[in-house]
């Protein structure tokens, strides 16, 4: 049972549930102090033991009579700029006189049942007030009149704290918010390894680790989206922490725009974590009476290793961040035409591809880029969301009806935020793009970014998309974004509000998503940004799944999907079987390995099934039958990482159903070897007293045996090849089905 307690006599707040505690207090100068975040502690009135302070050389002090109280050496909850603390602040305000000094002092608090919604922003939520409690702490800067509210939500079921901040200009003069983090967390030591998920296009969310030392470790984006380069996620783990044991802290920012996450280790090994909107180029003007709300950040603690941390994020995000009709539904198996045809298609060819897909058991056919306006290549058409009648003489309405007549659902690709200069939209409204007066406007993929900070632009795109969705039988939307933002300037905003454009842009994206998902609640949205360039929690609030990466090669996907699973549920990962040679790395991998990787996600095909052999079609049908039978557990089960592709030639992961009567293990080996050692892997999450049948070889083992000795994964590479055994090759994989048969009682 979660609880929020305020001890009046010591002015200490204690938020706790069965697994975690979060403790903060009001310091003697009225600021908030950070005392503890971690494993559940017994509650008591006085935690002053956790406040460490002493006099230090070369230190500035608040009070002349107290040479122990300096903000430089006290752990704080939401530190301000420039008042005896030389570390990076959580908030920085520019006042009309040029000062950047603030002093937010405690005023009051309130405890709210459930969780309030954040206006205009994605955030975790509750479906009943009994699921969570929210603490709102009010602080005020007496000189400027600015009022600050810090929000903390603690959940019953999750080892997580959701945090955000809100500021109101209750004074008489303008303020400029130059920096306002979603959270700040001061930890008492630096004995952590920092983990980030980084990469580039088609190599997203690779796991990168480094040891924290004095100084700053940071990731960020200034691209206008969360980016391929750095995901808005970080983890701190103790040096002895592995996947299944040890302490880990995870921080995830529910935001899709420019962000910054950093760890700053000071001179005495205190670690300050901050996460929020990137302050670079950010300047939000607050006139008297105006307010600003930060995005939400989620803080997770695990004493059960990285798997424990990930499972908290995965379950919380699958159930209390993703929303709507599709949140809990098994996702349809789809066939996307992009790598099958690119821009070279006709209506009849699309129907031919869809017909074969239906024959194989596919449920959804998706028409990707190239169907609209003058779009015959990537230089024209974006912004004109009207069907090209030369390609589609019956329009989207007619095509969707033909697809549905086959017994399939129909999906469609959009890139709502972009425009080509060769388009009717640009010719009519050349001022609707983000562009800096007097400067060259850069393109990406020959396209330009619409100014979604302007309501009339968002309204126009909404009107075009809603018209198509209303008139046609569209069950799925793939929403793409194929370039980053440059020359960020809005002709609609005055000069003193240009620092707001990046954030206003992403608020416009959220607004369009919100309107479309509200009006068309049964349409399944999949987010995309040249693959995984905006694969973040903010998107998950509107689109319950995202295209994980444009790299669909099975071997490349091992690292991509392994890293992605650090924070995101399997139900959010778009994962497809594509053609060989693969179009990104030109590798040939077996059809079964391509499917064995793609099963652990939403599953689909990125090819023309008409071009497969009869034997391959038979295998595809078997794959689809398997996925339909087990997709509930594959998409919504409890996921465990067992062997990392970043550490060796083998990758192993597994998923279990809720009652642990079924486990599906994915085993993958990149390169074959000669006379290799015997191999096994210790499984996780099984019932130790249950007997499991291994469907692969019909052996039976207790759960404790499989978790302590392990599942034997040796094959013929461990010795000579018998005459009746097919030799293994490179890029080999196997799916082990473990079905619980009985529980042995009284052992």
Can you annotate each of these PLM segments?
Residues 420-459, 503-610:
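Glycan-recognition surfaces
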Residues 99-106, 284-303, 731-738:
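Short Pro-Gly-centered flexible turn/kink motifs
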Residues 234, 243, 645-688:
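Carbohydrate-binding surface patches
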């Amino acid at each position: 049972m979660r609880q929020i307690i305020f001890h009046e006599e010591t002015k200490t707040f204690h938020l706790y549930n069965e697994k975690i505690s979060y403790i903060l207090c009001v310091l003697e100068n009225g600021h908030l102090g950070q005392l503890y975040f971690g494993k559940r502690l017994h509650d008591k009135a006085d935690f002053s033991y956790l406040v460490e302070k002493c006099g230090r050389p070369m230190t500035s002090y608040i009070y002349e009579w107290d040479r122990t109280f300096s903000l430089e050496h006290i752990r704080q909850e939401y530190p301000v700029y420039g008042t005896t603390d030389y570390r990076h602040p959580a908030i920085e305000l520019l006042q009309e006189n040029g000062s950047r000094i603030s002093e937010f002092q405690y005023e009051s608090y309130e405890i709210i049942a459930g969780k309030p919604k954040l206006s205009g922003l994605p955030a975790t939520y509750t479906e009943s007030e009994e699921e969570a409690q929210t603490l709102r702490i009010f602080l005020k800067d007496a000189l400027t009149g600015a009022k600050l509210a810090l929000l903390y939500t603690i959940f019953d079921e999750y080892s997580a704290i959701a945090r955000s901040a809100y500021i109101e200009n209750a004074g008489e003069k303008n303020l400029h918010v130059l920096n306002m983090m979603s959270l700040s967390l001061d930890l008492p030591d630096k004995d952590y390894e920092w983990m980030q998920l980084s990469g580039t296009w088609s190599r997203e969310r690779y796991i990168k680790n480094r040891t924290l030392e004095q100084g700053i470790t940071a990731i960020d984006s200034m691209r206008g989206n969360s980016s391929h380069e750095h995901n808005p996620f970080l983890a701190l783990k103790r040096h002895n922490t592995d996947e299944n044991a040890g302490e880990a802290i995870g921080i995830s920012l529910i935001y899709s725009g420019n962000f910054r996450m950093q760890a700053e280790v000071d001179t005495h090994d205190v670690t300050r974590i901050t996460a929020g909107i990137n302050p670079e180029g950010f300047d939000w003007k607050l006139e008297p009476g105006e307010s600003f709300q930060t995005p939400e950040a989620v803080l997770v603690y695990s004493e059960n290793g990285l798997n424990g941390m990930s499972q908290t994020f995965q379950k919380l995000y699958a159930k209390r961040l993703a929303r709507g009709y599709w949140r809990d539904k098994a996702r349809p198996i789809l066939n996307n035409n992009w790598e099958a045809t690119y821009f070279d298609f006709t209506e009849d060819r699309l129907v031919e591809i869809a017909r074969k897909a239906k024959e194989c058991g596919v449920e959804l056919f998706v028409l990707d880029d190239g169907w609209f306006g003058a779009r015959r290549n990537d230089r024209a058409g974006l912004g004109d969301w009207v069907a090209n009648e030369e390609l589609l003489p019956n329009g989207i309405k007619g095509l969707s009806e033909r697809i549905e007549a086959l017994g399939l659902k129909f999906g469609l690709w959009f890139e709502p935020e972009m425009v080509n200069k060769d388009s009717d939209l640009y010719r009519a409204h050349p001022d609707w793009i983000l562009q800096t007066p007097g400067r060259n406007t850069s393109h990406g993929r020959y396209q330009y970014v619409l100014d979604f900070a302007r309501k009339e632009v968002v309204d126009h795109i909404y009107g075009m998309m809603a018209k198509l969705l209303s008139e046609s039988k569209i069950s799925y939307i793939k929403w793409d974004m194929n370039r980053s933002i440059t020359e960020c300037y809005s002709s609609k905003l005055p000069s003193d509000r240009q620092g707001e454009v990046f954030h206003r842009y992403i608020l416009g994206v959220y607004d369009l998503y919100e309107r479309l998902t509200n009006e068309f609640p049964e349409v399944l949205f999949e987010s995309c940004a040249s693959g995984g360039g905006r694969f973040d929690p903010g998107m998950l609030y509107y689109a319950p799944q995202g295209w994980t990466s444009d790299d669909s090669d099975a071997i490349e996907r091992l690292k991509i999907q392994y890293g992605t699973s650090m924070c995101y549920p399997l139900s959010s990962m778009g994962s497809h079987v594509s053609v060989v040679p693969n179009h990104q790395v030109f590798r040939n991998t077996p059809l079964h390995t391509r499917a064995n990787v793609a099963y652990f996600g939403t599953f689909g095909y990125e090819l023309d099934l008409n071009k497969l052999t009869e034997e391959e079609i038979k295998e595809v049908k078997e794959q689809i039958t398997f996925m339909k039978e087990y997709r509930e557990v594959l998409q919504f089960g409890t996921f465990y990482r067992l062997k990392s592709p970043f550490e060796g030639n083998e990758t192993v992961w597994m998923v279990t159903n809720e009652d642990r009567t079924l486990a599906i293990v994915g085993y993958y080996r990149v390169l074959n070897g000669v006379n290799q050692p015997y191999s096994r892997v210790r499984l996780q999450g099984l019932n130790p007293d249950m007997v499991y049948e291994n469907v692969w070889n019909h052996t039976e083992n207790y759960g404790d045996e499989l978790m302590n000795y392990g599942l034997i994964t040796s094959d013929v590479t461990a010795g000579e090849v018998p005459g009746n055994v097919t030799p293994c090759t490179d890029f080999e994989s196997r799916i082990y089905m473990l079905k619980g048969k009985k529980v042995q009682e009284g052992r």
